[in-house]
């Protein structure tokens, strides 16, 4: 019986080696294992033939079968390692990552130049005793105009083109709406900064936009005078520009101050020689200012017989244009990284 089983063992061995040479993938190898080593495979068929072998020959035949099983298992394991390595290399070649190449540059974010300037202005004025207050961008006609001495039919309302949402609701045209609320909620002395966006229905040019940022400073107490306004403004500009700035105060009209004036500084872009920013005058208007009108104090619940105050407001974009030598306000809103990445902290 040994002679009848031995040829079968040799036949299975040869068939295994032949099939093994055809295997190209781990999936094909798994199918080969099932064919020869599985529960219904060729090797299991040999084990069933043991019952037909003479009892004294069974140990020897069983040894041959086990040797064949070990032979198959070793060859399968060896080929499996080779195929796994081959498939991994193929995948790496398909998804090539050259570790010797430099990594992708990570750009460090930075604050927008307007945000940098706003932070600097708030820092300076906070050191001078002012506290920061904020207010709504969308406000009522009452807080934007009426309480600030703009009666419903006042001709001064025509000075500013306004974005109206409804007949009595609008996008604020200045941050003075914060001053109005501060007077209602606080008793003098009041010393606040009112920063934020404001909106004007204007033509977009190199010097004007439909929205911009404004900072307003308000000081209300007993015996506040023009001398306090001039001293505060000059000290603020000196700290902001880090040098003594030549200023010019011109009489002007604003409904919420009396008397009113405009503050000009010598153009730092052209050093007073004339450029697009200063309209070739050598001067740039940076603020509107004045002593708070008695009617405004009265509307805010403050007795103008006992208290006085000053207020000034300035456009942030124009200040930054001076600080940075920028001649077009539109650059601030174009989100061009080539422009924005030029600026380090002030």
Curated annotation (Swiss-Prot):
<keyword id="KW-0436">Ligase</keyword>
<dbReference type="GO" id="GO:0006432">
    <property type="term" value="P:phenylalanyl-tRNA aminoacylation"/>
</dbReference>
<dbReference type="InterPro" id="IPR004188">
    <property type="entry name" value="Phe-tRNA_ligase_II_N"/>
</dbReference>
<dbReference type="GO" id="GO:0000287">
    <property type="term" value="F:magnesium ion binding"/>
</dbReference>
<keyword id="KW-0460">Magnesium</keyword>
<comment type="subunit">
    <text>Tetramer of two alpha and two beta subunits.</text>
</comment>
<keyword id="KW-0963">Cytoplasm</keyword>
<dbReference type="Pfam" id="PF02912">
    <property type="entry name" value="Phe_tRNA-synt_N"/>
</dbReference>
<keyword id="KW-0030">Aminoacyl-tRNA synthetase</keyword>
<feature type="binding site">
    <location>
        <position position="258"/>
    </location>
    <ligand>
        <name>Mg(2+)</name>
    </ligand>
</feature>
<dbReference type="GO" id="GO:0005737">
    <property type="term" value="C:cytoplasm"/>
</dbReference>
<keyword id="KW-0648">Protein biosynthesis</keyword>
<dbReference type="InterPro" id="IPR045864">
    <property type="entry name" value="aa-tRNA-synth_II/BPL/LPL"/>
</dbReference>
<dbReference type="GO" id="GO:0005524">
    <property type="term" value="F:ATP binding"/>
</dbReference>
<dbReference type="InterPro" id="IPR010978">
    <property type="entry name" value="tRNA-bd_arm"/>
</dbReference>
<dbReference type="GO" id="GO:0000049">
    <property type="term" value="F:tRNA binding"/>
</dbReference>
<dbReference type="InterPro" id="IPR002319">
    <property type="entry name" value="Phenylalanyl-tRNA_Synthase"/>
</dbReference>
<dbReference type="GO" id="GO:0004826">
    <property type="term" value="F:phenylalanine-tRNA ligase activity"/>
</dbReference>
<keyword id="KW-0067">ATP-binding</keyword>
<keyword id="KW-0547">Nucleotide-binding</keyword>
<protein>
    <recommendedName>
        <fullName>Phenylalanine--tRNA ligase alpha subunit</fullName>
        <ecNumber>6.1.1.20</ecNumber>
    </recommendedName>
</protein>
<dbReference type="InterPro" id="IPR006195">
    <property type="entry name" value="aa-tRNA-synth_II"/>
</dbReference>
<dbReference type="InterPro" id="IPR022911">
    <property type="entry name" value="Phe_tRNA_ligase_alpha1_bac"/>
</dbReference>
<keyword id="KW-0479">Metal-binding</keyword>
<dbReference type="Pfam" id="PF01409">
    <property type="entry name" value="tRNA-synt_2d"/>
</dbReference>
<dbReference type="InterPro" id="IPR004529">
    <property type="entry name" value="Phe-tRNA-synth_IIc_asu"/>
</dbReference>
<comment type="similarity">
    <text>Belongs to the class-II aminoacyl-tRNA synthetase family. Phe-tRNA synthetase alpha subunit type 1 subfamily.</text>
</comment>
């Amino acid at each position: 019986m040994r002679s009848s089983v031995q040829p079968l063992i040799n036949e299975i061995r040869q068939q295994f080696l032949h099939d093994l040479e055809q295997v190209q993938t781990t999936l094909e190898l798994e199918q080969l294992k099932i064919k020869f080593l599985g529960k219904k495979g060729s090797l299991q068929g040999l084990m069933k033939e043991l019952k037909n072998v003479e009892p004294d020959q069974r140990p020897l035949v069983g040894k041959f079968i086990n040797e064949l099983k070990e032979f198959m298992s070793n060859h399968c394991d060896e080929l499996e390692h080779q195929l796994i390595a081959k498939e991994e290399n193929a995948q790496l070649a398909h998804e090539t990552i050259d570790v010797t190449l430099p990594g992708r540059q990570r750009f460090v974010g930075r604050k927008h130049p307007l945000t940098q300037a706003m932070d600097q202005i708030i820092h300076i004025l906070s050191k001078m005793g002012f506290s920061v207050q904020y207010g709504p961008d969308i406000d009522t006609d009452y807080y934007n105009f009426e309480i600030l001495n703009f009666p419903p039919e006042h001709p001064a309302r025509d000075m500013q083109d306004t974005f109206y949402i409804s007949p009595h609701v609008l996008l604020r045209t200045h941050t003075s709406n914060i001053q109005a609320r501060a007077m209602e909620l606080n008793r003098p002395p009041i010393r606040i900064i009112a920063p934020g966006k404001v909106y004007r229905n204007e033509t977009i040019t190199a010097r004007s936009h439909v929205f911009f940022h404004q900072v307003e400073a308000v000081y209300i107490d007993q015996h506040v005078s023009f001398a306090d306004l001039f001293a505060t403004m000059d000290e603020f500009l000196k700290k902001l520009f880090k040098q003594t700035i030549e200023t010019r105060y011109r009489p002007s009209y604003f409904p919420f101050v009396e008397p009113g004036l405009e503050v000009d500084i010598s153009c730092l872009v052209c050093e007073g020689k004339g450029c697009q920013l200063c309209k070739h005058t050598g001067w740039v208007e940076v603020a509107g200012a004045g002593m708070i009108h008695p009617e405004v104090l009265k509307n805010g619940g403050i007795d103008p017989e006992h208290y006085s105050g000053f207020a000034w407001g300035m456009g942030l974009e124009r200040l930054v244009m001076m600080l940075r030598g920028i001649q077009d306000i539109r650059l601030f809103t174009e989100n061009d990284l080539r422009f924005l990445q030029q600026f380090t902290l002030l």
